[in-house]
């Protein structure tokens, strides 16, 4: 290859494999030599080496499948240094998966890490205590939050909140006032069931909680330390999958000349500048699903009076038994039954006076049509807000419909049926599947629909075998959450004064560069799927299903009701 990238020679087919394997080895050795130079500081050297080696590895793998050379983890792992303290609040399954990954990517003395949990698991804690991590048996409550936290973190430290039912406004406010970096995976309350029985449906939503956060933040005089909220797998990674999908859709549409003239020029410009809201609008995106199918199975079937899941049972029950919630697109012609609109804020969402676990929609993951539940999730708020286009007067010109479509593992589905029979009172025994899992995967991604290519899915297909190779005794579901937590922590360490941020405010390429090695098969693929592609004709002509055949992207076409049998 010459100076201007022109081809100056031809490699014979006989030597093709040998030459490219040796060339790859040469590039890797060159990168090691270059970035061990003392003229480059350690952190920059490691991150530049990571970027170059990851690029080379991916480039060769895509073009020459025979040229697979395993790179040592310490060579290709992006890493940051953190000299302050880290506090884990909660040490459930996600935290247990997060800690070993965190120590691969964040250089910190284990003695600077403290774990707080009110139900210690000695077997899970022992190896970390032996390495110098401190464990404290305690519980963060409304009457002790400040007293507990100030013992373990102060200005410049990092608090990773992986507990449940800690009021987000209170703990974010405390961290803001004390200069502490903060991360969580969901916006929660002290007691989500308090007053829930008689509350208006809109007051049970994440939208309502986010409006409370906005009111609190508006009173601050400075944005303060970085606090990244709702950065797990979903919400979290799903926002970055959505951005990547939009870029890939734009590339494919431009290459295939689906747009022309000034519109094509605008799309190319928005793609270049990552102006995602205008890009989605110009592409014609109507609907975005966070579509997930969990196929993990185990040798220990669910028993009577037992709730089995691959992640937090209490968390699933809490979000599944409250209102279904979704971002509401400007293309929608009518509200669904039991729908309520919000009266304050951007009014970008609606909720249903119907449990999310009992609200079913058709969706798609590669290569399955699934029946998913519209469980309340933070991405329905954050993605909708990020992709909204407003005029100078603040009126919304464009907004897609966004919601979760969750098909959990078989054991969880059986647990939900039993939960309904118990009038939503949680079973006396709960279990999160780990070592007993024998097969399956967690398939999680953004299904972006309504553009000229019909549908596009971007996300992770992570098998139980792959997740165990990365962190033993964990499952695919917790792995996707854990690596997202670590990536966000690294971004916070490098950007410590950004105030409150949602996943959509973080650079998607930064997060995905770190996360991809932990996500199994990273897929970005087009599909011709629509909710009307394959519809049942049972009782055709006698039940008159409420669908809109002229516009497949209306919510009524996704919603599964009794009249669609």
Predicted feature residues:
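Conserved N-terminal Rossmann-fold NAD(P)-binding element of oxidoreductases
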Residues: 87-90
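A short, basic/flexible loop-to-alpha-helix module at the beginning of a structural domain
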Residues: 68-83
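Hydrophobic/small residue at the entry helix of a nucleotide-binding pocket
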Residues: 94
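Rossmann-fold cofactor-recognition segment
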Residues: 130-142
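NAD(P)-binding Rossmann-fold cofactor-contacting core
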Residues: 110-127
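Rossmann-fold NAD(P)-binding glycine/threonine-rich loop
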Residues: 172, 186-223
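Short linear motifs in low-complexity or flexible loops
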Residues: 8, 12, 20, 31, ...
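C-terminal catalytic/substrate-binding lobe primarily of soluble NAD(P)-dependent oxidoreductases
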Residues: 248-565
